[in-house]
């Protein structure tokens, strides 16, 4: 499963986004299931609504309902870990959605991610010392 961040979803939906063509190429070529978190899902819906309108938000939700990707269920122990991560990276600062993706990586046992956030995900570490592999911006 490949982890997906908000920036990838936005690039995929927005034809004016600098990374739109790259996002389309990646989504056409990848053959692995995609997974995100409810924090990212919510952030994506909000940004799609405010930047592109209700139709874009509804298409995203319908993609989920059609099985286009999975959403990881966070438990209270995951939220505790997110709190620790947000404290650790307070100088960046780390937001809730990013913290949830680090927790997701820790649960999956890998950091293969689709994100346009090169800076932050080059700093974040899952299980405190493993780096993320950005499959979006590094895709051939």
Describe each model-derived feature in a short phrase.
Residues 109-140:
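Acidic, PIN/NYN-like endoribonuclease modules and their adjacent C-terminal/linker elements
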Residues 51-55, 90, 129-133:
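Short, hinge-like loop/turn segments at secondary-structure boundaries
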Residues 7-8, 39, 77, 119:
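Alpha-helix/helix-capping structural signal
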Residues 71-116:
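Active-site neighborhoods of divalent-metal-dependent phosphate/nucleic-acid chemistry enzymes
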Residues 29-33, 67, 92:
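Structured helix-beta-strand junction loops
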Residues 1-36, 49-61, 139-140:
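Short, well-structured N-terminal submotif of metal-dependent ribonuclease cores
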């Amino acid at each position: 499963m490949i982890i997906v961040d908000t920036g990838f979803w936005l690039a995929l939906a927005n034809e004016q986004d600098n990374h739109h063509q790259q996002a389309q190429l990646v989504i056409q070529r990848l053959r692995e299931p995609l997974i995100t978190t409810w924090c990212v899902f919510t952030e994506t819906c909000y940004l799609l609504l405010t930047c592109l309108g209700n139709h874009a938000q509804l298409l995203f939700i319908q993609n989920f309902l059609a099985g286009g990707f999975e959403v990881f269920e966070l438990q209270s122990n995951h939220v505790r870990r997110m709190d620790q991560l947000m404290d650790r990276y307070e100088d960046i600062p780390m937001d809730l959605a990013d913290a949830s993706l680090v927790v997701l990586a820790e649960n999956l046992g890998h950091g293969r991610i689709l994100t346009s956030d090169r800076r932050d995900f080059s700093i974040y570490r899952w299980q405190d010392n493993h780096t993320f592999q950005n499959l979006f911006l590094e895709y051939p």
